[in-house]
Amino acid sequence: MVGPLTNRPQQQFGLPEYLTYCAAVGANPVITIATSVGNPNDAADLVEYLNAPANNSNPNGGTDWAALRSADGHTAPWNVVWFEYGNEEFNTPRSVEEYVSKYPLYQASMKAVAPNIKLGAVFDDSTNVKNGWTYTVLQRLGQKIDFGIVHPYLPKLNKDAALNTTPEQVKLAAISADADLVYRLDLYNSLIRQVTGRTDLALAVTEYNSLFVQDKPAPYRQTLVNALHNADYLRILLKPASNVLFANFWQFANSYWGMVTGFTHLGQTPVKQANHYVFALYNKYLGAHLVKMDTQSTPIDFSGGLGISPRIGVATTKSDPVTVPVPPDWSRRLFIDGSQSQANNVVTVNFNKNTDVNYYHAYKEFDAEPNTLYRVSVNVRTTDIKGGKIGIAVEDSRGWKEMHDQPANIFLTGTTPWTLVTVEYRTVADAKKMRLIARRISGEGSISGIAEFGAFSIEKITQNLGTVESVVGTASKSADGKELYLVLINKNLNNPVDTSIQINGNFRSVLAESLIGSSPLSTNLEAEKTDHVKIIPLLIREIKVGIVTIQLPASSVTGIKLARR
């Protein structure tokens, strides 16, 4: 990925080109350190290439990487600060024990070359904070890591689930995800303080978007309503209480996820998609300092689904857990890819057929209340597990094929003592029953070893996330305080909203623009129709000093600029 382009014909956009691009647009590069190949010395060599002076100092020995950087056309150090140790490691065959044992070695080697670099540690993508991957990382590395890495992809929908999901459900899920994001960030930050005692350990959201992995009936990831969703995510991530250092939208340019689509080397014209315009508006209408803003709007209800909690009624705080009495025995399905037995309410599974088995054959169903948070915990022990990870999952008893939502905590491998494994799950508005599942997910190759699933407990927690505010936004001001900026999101899918804005101070309206489309599901993907989603000017009226009015279009993101008189 470095050196002359002629020596890397299959990697024309390598490290030098990436860094040059970041410098050109004023972005701070974030570089992921591979965990599946290489070693700490390789990571130190990378830091030398990026940050060491080209003066023959060669701080890591061996190849003079700073000299190679200079030969690549950049004599001065790039001074890269931000690095990730791995990417979504909880989804790989590597164990959390391997991860926490190697992180300090990489961090020490890299900082020996450039002490100012920051190396982030991967947290898992879940609300499993009582134990599991994130808890172990914080417990073992909490005093060492420079920041925590999270990827809060919500809502979630794949092509199979899309067959049983209406476009209306998708649209409502997209505009209802903000409360779940706040809830998840709060869990991470609370866990950091609880386990490490640190108040200086922040989060980096190095990927975010919806997880709409489908194309029919519409590629929801590229729609206007998903742009509203991502604008809403930005609103949350900007809040100081979120404790987020930086955030990276997934992704900039790519034919599937990209906010800009079209391959120029194939003669295609780059086209700005709906998500691109969100960042164009924030870039233009976000000042240097946030300003407090209160909003009042007509609420929107959502019954829950696609990984998003129900949004009905008045928001309430989380109650103390109440234990739900459930008989201790497990139910079992026929299992032919190994053997399983139950004694003293412990299910023992022997993966002795050397297959890539999808295990879900021991389970427990129980009654559940609608719109309620449940915490399900199971004692699990593993013996010589190779080729995968063991844990538990929870779902609505209607099952994956109908609900397509199964939160899981799957992280045990090798030989482990009895370990309490916990999953949190919030039921949808029409829930009647839940299912606890002993789990191993296929796809990691043949598995061998023994897993035991023992005593479990189920706790009920009352908490309502409340209805969706239909109009939300961010207020900010310029560094000198002479300009005031607003970014307003109208989540009303089909109706414009006449909006009155009251401002403390003597400001006059200067400019207003809005991201709109012909419908919430509009995209710019059609070859001859690349302006279905676009930014248009809006009329803003001053009624009297301190009060302006504007009509926010349906399904829109609007930027407003005001200047002090």
Label each PLM-derived region with a short phrase.
Residues 1-160:
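N-terminal catalytic cores of secreted or lumenal carbohydrate-active enzymes
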Residues 8, 118, 289-470, 474-481, ...:
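Extracellular and organelle-lumenal recognition/adhesion modules and their flexible linkers in secreted
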Residues 22, 46, 83, 148, ...:
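Conserved, mostly hydrophobic/aromatic
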Residues 482-492:
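Short, well-ordered beta-strand segments enriched in hydrophobic/aromatic residues
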